[in-house]
């Protein structure tokens, strides 16, 4: 069959890598793709938000199945557009993708259906938000309601910081229309854990847990990024935590969406905080995380197409997700200066060192080909995701960091403490 993957990041490279393992596939397209994806798929110069062009391409090339990796097109309703044309596509419809598209919606949903989360208030007026903050307990969390590339969350330690945050989100519109509504949330302490799942709208099956590293600099300092590295599974996601989440969070979320007439088919990413009072939901995403996909998918034994189809067909209960009993660590190689200002278009060397390896992967995020069609250049803030698989987290971490030395580009930057928490488990 012919498969189209929509997106251009490390997550999409991981998805394409999994799709390429399927014996059912004879042709993969990726729109728009990147220089790494190009070794496995035919990259097509169509942007992820160009729905009409994507549909026309899928029809013209008789694409049998489309997988959408990114949040923007899902929240924008790409699945509805494909389905209206009779095309098979994996991902939630627009009315379900709101679970990530609006933080205010997701908070109200959790409140209504008693899904554990932090106390909060939603605001559409900066004046009301400022008035509320005058008497609020610090630290406090401000969240832009809409999509903000994973950067729309501010943790404020003082009232002054909180006031500045309201100005940034609601008045200066740092995140554009995403800040028209703002969520003010109590600050929760504990360990963060990400859990990826597949659901067909009735059944939900958990893939694996992972832990992200959002901040740009070592020691969790610096600005929020899309993610600087990851490890999976999380040693803090214990059997007890899993049992609690299965009872009060996972199925409850799927059932709540169905009860609201927003049946969810696709991937739900649960961002959890393991607080002293038990696990609580920090956020939902409606797609594979990035770089979570890079640490979870390489361990999946199932044919990804079988699982994705089961989600769409409502037959996920007939399938058992299976994962290798191994650990994975991903270290992101970024352009120095990310997430603010950084140079692009710099040549990358050493990529051939990863050829033929089955336990070390180099997932491309921000890369493109030079005019010569051969040289690979940097093309973004996050450039590569160096991922290693091993029997233990410590071995995987050592292997991943060793492999970061195999590749070079002029402004290569990484955190040196990805997976530090492994030592605290």
Placement of each model-derived feature along the sequence:
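Active-site "cap" helix and flanking loop/linker of ATP-utilizing ligase/carboxylase catalytic domains
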Residues: 246-268, 285-359
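Generic C-terminus detector
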Residues: 367, 371-373, 377-425
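Short acidic-hydrophobic, aromatic-tinged amphipathic segments that line or gate anion-handling sites
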Residues: 43-49, 121-125, 156
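A conserved helix-loop-beta module that forms one wall/lid of the active-site cleft
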Residues: 90-152
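ATP-binding N-terminal substructure of ATP-dependent carboxylate-amine bond-forming enzymes
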Residues: 1-94
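Solvent-exposed alpha-helices and their adjacent loops that cap or buttress functional pockets
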Residues: 20-21, 36-38, 60, 90, ...
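Internal nucleotide-binding/catalytic subdomain
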Residues: 152, 156-293
């Amino acid at each position: 069959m012919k498969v189209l993957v929509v997106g251009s990041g490390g997550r999409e490279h991981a998805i394409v890598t999994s799709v390429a393992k399927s014996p059912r596939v004879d042709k993969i397209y990726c729109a728009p793709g990147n220089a790494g994806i190009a070794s496995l798929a035919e990259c097509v110069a169509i942007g992820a938000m160009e729905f009409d062009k994507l549909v026309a391409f899928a029809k013209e090339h008789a694409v049998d199945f489309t997988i959408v990796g990114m949040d923007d097109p899902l929240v924008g309703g790409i699945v509805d557009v494909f389905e209206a044309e009779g095309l098979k596509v994996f991902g939630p419809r627009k009315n379900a993708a709101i679970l990530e598209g609006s933080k205010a919606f997701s908070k109200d949903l959790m409140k209504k259906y008693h899904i554990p989360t932090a106390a909060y208030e939603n605001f559409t007026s900066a004046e009301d938000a400022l008035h509320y903050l005058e008497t609020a307990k610090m630290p406090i969390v401000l969240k832009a309601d809409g999509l903000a590339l994973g950067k729309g969350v501010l943790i404020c330690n003082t009232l002054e910081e909180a006031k500045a945050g309201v100005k940034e989100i609601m008045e200066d519109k740092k995140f554009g229309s995403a800040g028209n509504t703002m969520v003010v949330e109590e600050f929760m302490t504990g360990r963060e854990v990400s859990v990826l799942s597949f659901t067909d709208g009735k059944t939900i099956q958990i893939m694996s847990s992972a832990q992200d590293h959002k901040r740009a600099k070592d020691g969790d300092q610096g600005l929020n990024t899309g993610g600087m590295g990851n490890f999976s599974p999380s040693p803090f996601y214990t059997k007890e935590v899993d049992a609690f989440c299965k009872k009060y969070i996972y199925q409850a979320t799927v059932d709540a969406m169905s009860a609201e007439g927003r049946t969810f088919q696709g991937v739900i990413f649960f961002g959890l905080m393991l607080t002293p009072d038990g696990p609580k939901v920090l956020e939902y995403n409606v797609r594979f995380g990035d770089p979570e996909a890079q640490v979870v998918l390489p361990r999946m034994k199932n044919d990804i197409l079988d699982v994705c189809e089961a989600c769409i067909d409502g037959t996920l209960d007939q399938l058992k997700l299976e994962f290798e009993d191994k650990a994975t660590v991903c270290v992101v190689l970024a352009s120095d200066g990310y997430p603010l200002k950084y140079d692009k278009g710099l040549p990358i060397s050493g990529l051939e060192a990863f050829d033929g390896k089955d336990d070390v992967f180099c997932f491309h995020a921000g890369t493109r080909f030079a005019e010569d069609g051969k040289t690979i250049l940097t093309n973004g803030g996050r450039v590569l995701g160096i991922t290693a698989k091993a029997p233990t987290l410590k071995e995987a971490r050592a292997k991943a960091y060793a492999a970061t030395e195999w590749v070079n580009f002029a402004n290569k930057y990484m955190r040196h403490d990805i997976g530090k928490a492994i030592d605290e488990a």
